[in-house]
Amino acid sequence: TGTAGPVRWHVLLADARAPEENDASAQVLVTVESGAGPVTTLVTGDMEEDASAAWVAGHRSDAAAPPRVDVLKVAHHGARNGGTAVPRAVGARLHMVSVGADNPYGHPHRATVDALGRLGPVARTDLHGTLALTAADGPNSDGAPEITAHTVRPPSSVRTGP
């Protein structure tokens, strides 16, 4: 847990004893106090589907289930093995996928992107470049800030050969 100006963060889960390396990655809740109100973001690591489903179902003795948030940084670059349990549970209004353009792993997986798209808007760094978020008073009936993702720097291309 820590703070820096208007930003607070809290590690919700980081399991160094996880049998799978990806499942040991930290899950961090970040809250930014904006002029339009607080914006919560769940920054997920590379936790895979089974561990994510157990977390969401409350089957962890070391962590509460993930909270509802405004923004979700999607697990494992949108890989298929990240699952959709956390995105469905947190009810984010914006899903961000951090992934390199033309990466050799084929991330994000089409099925993951399709599932996220059914839950709400998806911003991807491979398509949209480096992203920044802004929060403004908006038309949201729940009084929550309107969140917009903006491209700060376009995605770069990778060239091989002469």
Model-predicted segments: where are they?
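Cap/insert and terminal regions of metallo-dependent hydrolase folds
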Residues: 52-132
